[in-house]
């Protein structure tokens, strides 16, 4: 057993998990449960009353956090200490949304001035493009932005841009390309005019395979459509640390935006990686996005554990994963603009906490990162919600909804909200056999049939959920929401004593993929790998099965 699972608090939680009453009983015996188990911060309200948790549960979870030195670990992250120990890096995505008055030291120097300088550079660039001052090679203004990246440099900008669609500049359209599948970029290029298209290449090394391949294809298309190599600088900019490679490509050094080692890809949307977002919604709104995240940073850093929204959410998820064998969490967004958030949170959580050894290399003997999945309501109610209600797996759910819609049409939003709240209630209380039987009392079924159908209509309830509300989806509330999930992920990793900021599983896939690519291009069939890999590579080389 590890030190964590040997601890008295862990053992107490394990014993306690077997004695928590059904949530029906918890609500029946405490009419003030919502008031006791809800919290507002940074424009968000968290209702966590529909959880399998009592005051004793929370006390034990907070004790687990304290015993795991969570508060000290939070301070260490904000202070710029080397908490990504395997890569010997600080973790300071929070510095990207700091205020100009702050001082944050990384590797012996204050990084805030450079962050502010980059934001100011972004401001000038955004102004140039959106005002029409930036011209393409034929003198026309830019109408289309193509953001080329992969992982965090793709998913963050795409999902945030999608979420903030009501704030878009109507004169601009943005397209996102990530997959190395040629179909992805080909379908985008079919829509574009090279004279009015601007490409943003986002890669720290300017050598990420998928991103570089897509960028080279974009340049070939641009040149084939009439542009010259000398015109590339008017249509390509980069977010990278490798200035030399970017300038060799044809990008003007003045149009290269920095990346830093202390920002991981899945936390990078707050940096110049967010340039597509800034172009679409303007720098004032982009700064509001940063401000909302900064407010959540301040809350996370300063609120006591018992009143700390990311801490509470992280602990509850850990509670189900480690003591109820919950293998996944579902994120359900009751707002069409937020439909991409489950995929974003999936990358954030699973790439961060999909680890199996502690910081000192000891194999864990407890579950770590759960599978994160989900979708938008009410679509999911006609699909996978069935499994949530009557399936055998326990799947904690997060419901996310703005109280006000950007598109208030008739009763649409009232119906959306009623479905959202109704689902949380149904998951919590379920339906007993007697209730199901009573509903069938006036049906034409026989007594035997009623008994049978009633059994099929039983729902156990006691299925946990959180509900997150905001007044309206704005850049600020979205920033706070994303930062909330970033810190929730940190909380769990800190207690599990794992490194939430490396991704060696991703790196292995890259290495083996490059090796296979070499073998695909070889002059002879492959026979040096395992039988399956040899056969698959050789079938691909033949081009048919």
UniProtKB/Swiss-Prot annotation:
EC number, as in UniProt: 5.3.1.9
Location of the protein in the cell: Cytoplasm
GO terms for cellular component: cytosol
A GO term for molecular function: carbohydrate derivative binding
Keywords carried by this UniProt record: Cytoplasm, Gluconeogenesis, Glycolysis, Isomerase
S-S pairs: none
Catalytic reaction(s) noted: alpha-D-glucose 6-phosphate = beta-D-fructose 6-phosphate
Pathway: Carbohydrate biosynthesis; gluconeogenesis; Carbohydrate degradation; glycolysis; D-glyceraldehyde 3-phosphate and glycerone phosphate from D-glucose: step 2/4
One GO term of the biological process aspect: glycolytic process
Record-annotated active site: 351, 382, 510
InterPro entries in the cross-refs: G6P_Isomerase, G6P_Isomerase_C, Phosphoglucose_isomerase_CS, SIS_dom_sf, SIS_PGI_1, SIS_PGI_2
Main enzyme class: isomerase
Leader sequence segment: none
Family, similarity comment: Belongs to the GPI family.
Function, as annotated: Catalyzes the reversible isomerization of glucose-6-phosphate to fructose-6-phosphate.
Protein name in UniProt: Glucose-6-phosphate isomerase
Organism annotation: Shewanella baltica (strain OS223)
């Amino acid at each position: 057993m590890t030190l964590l699972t040997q601890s008295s608090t862990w053992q107490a939680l394990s014993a306690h998990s077997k004695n928590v009453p059904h949530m029906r009983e918890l609500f029946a015996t405490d009419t003030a449960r919502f008031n006791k188990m809800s919290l507002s911060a940074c424009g968000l309200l968290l209702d966590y009353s529909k959880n399998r948790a009592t005051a004793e549960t929370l006390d034990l979870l907070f004790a687990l956090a304290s015993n795991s030195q969570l508060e000290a670990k939070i301070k260490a992250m904000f202070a710029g200490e080397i908490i990504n120990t395997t890569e010997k890096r600080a973790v300071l995505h929070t510095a990207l949304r700091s205020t100009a008055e702050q001082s944050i030291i990384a590797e012996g120097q204050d990084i805030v001035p450079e962050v502010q300088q980059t934001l100011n550079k972004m401001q000038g660039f955004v102004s140039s493009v959106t005002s029409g001052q930036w011209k393409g090679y034929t003198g026309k203004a830019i109408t289309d932005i193509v953001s080329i990246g992969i992982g965090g440099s793709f998913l963050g900008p795409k999902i945030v841009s999608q979420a903030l669609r009501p704030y878009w500049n109507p004169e601009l359209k943005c397209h996102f390309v990530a997959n190395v599948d040629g179909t992805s970029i080909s379908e985008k290029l079919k829509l574009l005019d090279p004279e009015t298209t601007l490409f943003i290449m986002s890669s720290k090394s300017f050598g990420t395979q998928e991103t570089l391949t897509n960028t080279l294809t974009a340049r070939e298309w641009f040149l084939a459509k009439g542009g010259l190599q000398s015109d590339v600088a008017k249509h390509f900019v980069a977010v990278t640390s490798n200035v030399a490679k970017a300038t060799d490509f044809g990008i003007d050094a003045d149009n290269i935006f920095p990346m830093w080692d202390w920002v991981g890809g899945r936390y990078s949307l707050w940096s110049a990686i967010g340039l597509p977002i800034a172009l679409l919604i303007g720098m004032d709104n982009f700064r509001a996005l940063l401000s909302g995240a900064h407010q959540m940073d301040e809350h996370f850093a300063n609120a006591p554990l018992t009143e700390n929204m990311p801490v509470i959410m992280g602990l509850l998820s850990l509670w189900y994963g480690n003591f109820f064998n919950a293998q996944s969490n579902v994120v359900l967004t009751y707002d069409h603009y937020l439909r991409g958030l489950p995929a974003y949170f999936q990358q954030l959580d699973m790439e961060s906490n999909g680890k199996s050894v502690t910081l000192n290399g000891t194999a864990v003997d407890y579950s770590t990162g759960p599978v994160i999945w989900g979708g938008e309501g009410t679509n999911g109610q006609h699909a996978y919600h069935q499994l949530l209600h009557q399936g055998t797996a326990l799947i904690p759910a997060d419901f996310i909804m703005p109280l006000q819609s950007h598109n208030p049409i008739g009763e649409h939003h009232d119906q959306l909200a009623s479905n959202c709240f109704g689902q949380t209630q149904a998951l919590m209380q379920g339906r007993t056999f007697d209730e199901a039987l009573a509903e069938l009392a006036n049906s034409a079924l026989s007594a035997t049939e009623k008994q049978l159908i009633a059994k099929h209509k039983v729902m156990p309830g006691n299925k946990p959920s959180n509900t997150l509300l905001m007044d309206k989806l704005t850049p600020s509330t979205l920033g706070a929401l994303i930062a909330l999930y970033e810190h929730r992920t940190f909380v769990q990793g800190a207690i599990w004593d794992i490194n939430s900021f490396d991704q060696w599983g991703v790196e292995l896939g890259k290495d083996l993929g490059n090796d296979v690519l070499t073998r695909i291009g070889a002059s002879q069939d492959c026979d040096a790998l395992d039988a399956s890999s040899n056969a698959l590579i050789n079938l691909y080389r033949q081009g048919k099965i």
